[in-house]
Design a protein with these regions (language model features):
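Nucleotide-sugar donor-binding/catalytic module of glycosyltransferases
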Residues: 1-149
Length: 149
């Protein structure tokens, strides 16, 4: 069993997709599987996914009709075999030890859910979200989930 299944819904993401996949596949935690679900892209996203799958056995690719990101995530989840699941968007980037840090923290704390610091870049400015209080105040997670890490 892989430690982490990384699920990436992909829709017309060719511009950023290679960089996104590189940040996942170059993680210090190597015991992962990447499940990329092409959600009916009209650009060359599928060809990029095929290229990565041919080069790295940790890549699993699925092609589906467009159903939106939730349908793509659910499809990926149906194929996931990892101990933990990490949802990742096709235009996101990770620091190289992000999955290892979150996995080790989850194991050590016997956590069901781990939320890490992240930055949001809207093309103009960068906003850092650093702690649970900020997430709760933004209604990103249910305010009753106080026991999460």
């Amino acid at each position: 069993m892989k430690k982490v299944s990384v699920i990436v819904p992909v829709y017309n993401a060719a511009e950023f997709l290679a960089e996104t996949l590189d940040t996942i596949l170059n993680q210090t935690l190597e015991d992962i599987e990447v499940i990329a679900v092409n959600d009916g892209s009209a650009d060359n996203s599928w060809e990029i996914l095929e290229d990565y799958a041919a080069r790295d056995t940790r890549m699993h690719i699925i092609d589906q009709k467009n159903g939106g990101p939730s349908a793509a995530r659910n499809n990926g989840l149906n194929h996931a075999e990892g101990e933990y699941v990490f949802f990742f968007d096709s235009d996101d980037l990770l620091v190289e030890d992000a999955l290892e840090i979150m996995y080790e923290k989850a194991k050590r704390m016997d956590a069901d859910l781990v939320i890490g610091k992240y930055d949001i870049f809207n093309g103009v400015s960068l906003t850092s979200v650093k702690n649970l209080d900020e997430l709760v105040s933004q209604d990103v997670i249910d305010k009753y989930d106080k026991g999460i890490l």
